[in-house]
C-alpha cells in the first residue's frame, strides 16, 4: 500500500515542476512578443501610411476630423487602445445589418442620431485644403506680428478654424484658393485671409502660441496675428477660384455713385477685371466694353433684374447695347456681413432653431448668423461645423449667448425648455435623401451607390419618415411661440423670408446686410458636383408611407392656424 502512495507523490512533484516551467516559458514568450510589437508599431505610426488603419481613442472622443489621415501623423498620439477605422467609416457599422429602428422609441432614435453626428465622415472644411506635408515657409514670407485689439478686423475675407491640425501652409492654401494675398494665424487654431495688412504691428514675442498642428511654428496669440504672404500655390493644392458669371443687368443711372472703384483698359478681359476687383476686396466685377467696375450689391444694384445675355454680348455681330453690363462674382467674399460675435448680454428669450435632420438647419444658421451678426448655438457639438466658422458650436447650448440654438429634439420636456422657436420644415422626400447622404458621406458628400442598394436605405426610411412627422407634430403641440418656415420658401424668396426670421428674433437688420447675405447665400454648405445616384430611391411602398405622414402634418398645420404644406409636398 505504501509503495503506490510514494509513486503518486513522486509523480505529483514532477508535475508541479513541469507546470512551473511551462508558466515561466509562457510569460517570457509573451513579453518578447510585446516588445517586438512595440518596436514595429512605432515606425509605422511615424510613417502614417495613406490607407488609414486605426485611430486613437482620444481622437474618437474628440469627434473632430475623425477620418483625416493627417491626425495619424502626430507622433505624440497614443498608440494603444486603437479602434478599427473601417468600422467607423462604414455606415453599416453605425447600425448593424438586420437591426431595425424602433418606430415608437423616438428618444432611442435621436440618441443614435446624435452618436452618429460626432462621427461624421466629413473630411476637412471647404476652406482648408489637405496639406500634403509639413509647412513650407519658403513659399510665402513671414511679415510679422500684428494686433487687431479694439478695432475692426482687417483680415476678414475668409475665416476658418482647426483646433487640432492648423498649420501655416494649411492657412496659406485656404487663402490662396480664394485669391487673397495675406494669411493671418491667431490663437494657434484660427486662420484669417485678406488683401490689406493690419495697421498695428507689435513685438514678435507677443505672437507666442504654437500652431496646433505644427510644433515650432508660431500661430499668433489672443488678438495677435502672425501674418504671412500667400505666395505661389504648392503642387496638389486646390486651384484658385475663378470669377463666376452672374448675368446681364441694366446699368444703374448713376454709375459713378453706385460703383466704388473702376478701371479702363484696352482689350479688357474678365480675368483682368476680376483680379483688379479681388485685390480691392470687392465681391462683384462689372464689365462693360473696356470699362471695369467693382462694387457690392446695393438697393440700387441688387442683381434681381437680370435680362437676356444677348444684350451684353461683346460679339461684333450682336453689338451689345450700351445701357447693360456683365456681372461676375469674384472669389472674394462680401465682408459687410462676415463679422459675428456672441451676444453682449445673456438673452432673456431662449430661442430654438428646430428642424428634422436634413431639413437645412446648418444653411439656415449660416443665413441667420450673417444677417444678425450674432453666433448661433447648438444642442450638439459638431467639430466639422466649428472648423467652418460656427463658433457657437463650442458654447454650451444653455449659455444664452447665442441668437438661437439648433436642435433636432422633440418631445414635451425638450420643447418646453425653449421660450420660442423657428420651426424649419422641408419636403420629407428631400430631407430623407439629404440626411442619408450626411450619415454616409458627411455634410457635403453623397452616399455611394452600395448604400442605396443595401438594406440600410429601406430601414432608414421606415424609421426616419415617422420621426419627420412626429417632430413637427410635437413642436406644434408643445411649442410656446412658433414661427413656421418652409425650406423651399426660404430658398425661393430668401430676403423676405429671412427678414421675417430676424424680426422674430427681435433684431434690426439693414437692407444692405440682407443683400450681402443674399450675395453669399450658399456659404460652404451646399453639396457640389453631380449626384452619383440619380435614380428614384423611393419604392411605391415607401411613397405610400411618406405620403400618409405628409397628409397628417398638412392637416395639423391648418388646425393650428398655419398655412398648409407647400403644394410640392402634397401627393397628387
UniProtKB/Swiss-Prot annotation:
Protein name: Sialate:O-sulfotransferase 1
Annotated PROSITE patterns: WSC
InterPro entries associated with the record: P-loop_NTPase, Sialate-O-sulfotransferase, Sulfotransferase_dom, WSC_carb-bd
Residues listed as glycosylation sites in the UniProt record: 105, 254
Location of the protein in the cell: Golgi apparatus membrane
A Pfam short name: Sulfotransfer_1
Bilayer topology: Single-pass type II membrane protein
Annotated family: Belongs to the WSCD family.
Keyword Membrane belongs to the record: yes
Gene Ontology MF term list: sulfotransferase activity
Function (record text): Sialate:O-sulfotransferase which catalyzes 8-O-sulfation at the Sia-glycan level using 3'-phosphoadenosine 5'-phosphosulfate (PAPS) as a donor, forming 8-O-sulfated Sia (Sia8S)-glycans. Displays selectivity toward glycolipids such as GM1 gangliosides.
Cellular component terms per the entry's GO annotation: Golgi membrane
Alphabetically ordered keywords of this record: Glycoprotein, Golgi apparatus, Membrane, Repeat, Signal-anchor, Transmembrane, Transmembrane helix
Reactions performed catalytically: a ganglioside GM1b + 3'-phosphoadenylyl sulfate = an 8-O-sulfo-ganglioside GM1b + adenosine 3',5'-bisphosphate + H(+)
